[in-house]
A protein has these predicted regions:
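Catalytic tyrosine of NAD(P)H-dependent dehydrogenase/reductases that use a Tyr as the general acid/base
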Residues: 22, 30
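Conserved SDR Rossmann-fold cofactor-binding beta-strand/turn motif
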Residues: 46-56
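C-terminal helical subdomain
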Residues: 49-50, 69-116
């Protein structure tokens, strides 16, 4: 028995301009998760995926090649998820009773409808 939890993204569901490679890799994570679930079922190994939306990390700074001003603008006008929010969701998935399996969990901040739509005040 065991549990594998892969981290995907909302970008595997809703692609965004300039995110072709990122979205493709997250789609691959989703396919791997589903395939492993089938392959490992008889061994009582759970395989789950969590797909976070916008999380305030260094992701945007890396995406904009160190341009902190551009990166900070991504998160202006709304409260994105924190790494702690995602960790809480991971813990929730991992702590379910043995007979309960969460295959896929989508988590976003309240202001985010999908990868392309975020309400900013």
């Amino acid at each position: 028995s065991g549990h594998i939890i892969n981290v995907s993204s909302t970008a595997d569901r809703d692609m965004y301009l300039g995110g072709n490679v990122y979205s493709a890799t997250k789609c691959a994570v989703d396919a791997l998760t589903k395939s492993l679930r089938l392959d490992l079922l008889e061994h009582n190994i759970k395989v789950s995926s969590i797909a976070p939306g916008m999380v305030h990390t260094e992701f945007s700074e890396v995406r904009f090649h160190g341009n902190k001003e551009l990166a900070d603008n991504v998160y202006k006008g709304f409260e994105p998820l924190s790494a702690h929010d995602v960790a809480d969701a991971l813990l929730y998935i991992a702590s379910r009773p043995a007979h309960v399996h969460i295959g896929d969990l989508l988590i976003t901040c309240t202001a985010q409808a999908n990868s392309n739509v975020v309400y900013k005040s």
